[in-house]
């Protein structure tokens, strides 16, 4: 209710990095973390831009778009990675792990985001991205190695890479960073909270379209709105 609206609104001007970005909604995402575990790279709080008259005419309806391309690695995946890697940092500190391998299958965005956030955790994380050979754009291919990740290109498609990642996660101390990781979904719930806050906590009458991919993102957004309904 009003308590939560006031709390989240009050954080709009905070200078504490740990409670900026997606962690403005800390209590809804990851209340087990200490502030020292939270990784903030400027993700989240992206603007909602009204479409131009030309775009509205082409689509046939008035609409606006949330520009998540302004996130650090240029995609909405950064929301989930901020949460997932903050959790990993917390786990490593709590259990004093000296080495954890992070791995993901990707056609571009996921590997870029995972490598970037892993680089800010540093040791004990090692990072590997599995990409389908020839299926990643030239613009996205340099992003993971640019953040220090090892990139392995495998024959086949994304699903073939994902099978390898799942096998590794099931049999070794490996952190899977695809959307099967529930901490990824929690971080991406922030999309829903930001939309609601942007519109003064009243989203009645709005229809929201989101990138779907393998449905992890739409699951996160729906979960976020359902949580808000309960509050």
How does the language model describe each region?
Residues 1-231:
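PLP-dependent amino-acid enzyme catalytic core
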């Amino acid at each position: 209710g009003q308590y939560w609206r006031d709390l989240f609104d009050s954080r709009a001007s905070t200078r504490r990095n740990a409670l900026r970005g997606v962690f403005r909604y800390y209590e809804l995402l990851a209340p087990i973390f200490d502030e020292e575990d939270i990784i903030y790279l400027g993700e989240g709080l992206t603007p909602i831009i009204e479409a131009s008259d030309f775009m509205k005419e082409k689509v046939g309806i008035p609409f606006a778009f949330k520009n998540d391309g302004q996130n650090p690695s240029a995609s909405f995946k950064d929301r989930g990675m901020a949460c997932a890697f903050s959790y990993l940092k917390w786990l490593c500190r709590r259990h004093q792990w000296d080495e954890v391998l992070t791995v993901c299958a990707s056609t571009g965005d996921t590997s870029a985001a995972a490598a970037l956030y892993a680089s800010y955790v540093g040791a004990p994380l090692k990072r590997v991205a599995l990409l389908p050979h020839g299926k990643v754009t030239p613009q996205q291919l340099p992003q993971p190695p640019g953040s220090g990740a090892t990139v392995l290109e495998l024959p086949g498609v994304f699903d073939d890479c994902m099978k390898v990642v799942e096998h590794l996660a099931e049999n070794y101390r490996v952190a899977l960073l695809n959307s099967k990781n529930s901490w990824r979904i929690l971080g991406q719930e922030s999309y829903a909270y930001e939309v609601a806050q942007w519109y003064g906590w009243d989203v009645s009458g709005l229809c929201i379209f989101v990138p779907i991919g393998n449905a992890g993102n739409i699951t996160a957004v729906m979960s976020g709105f359902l949580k808000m309904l309960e509050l």
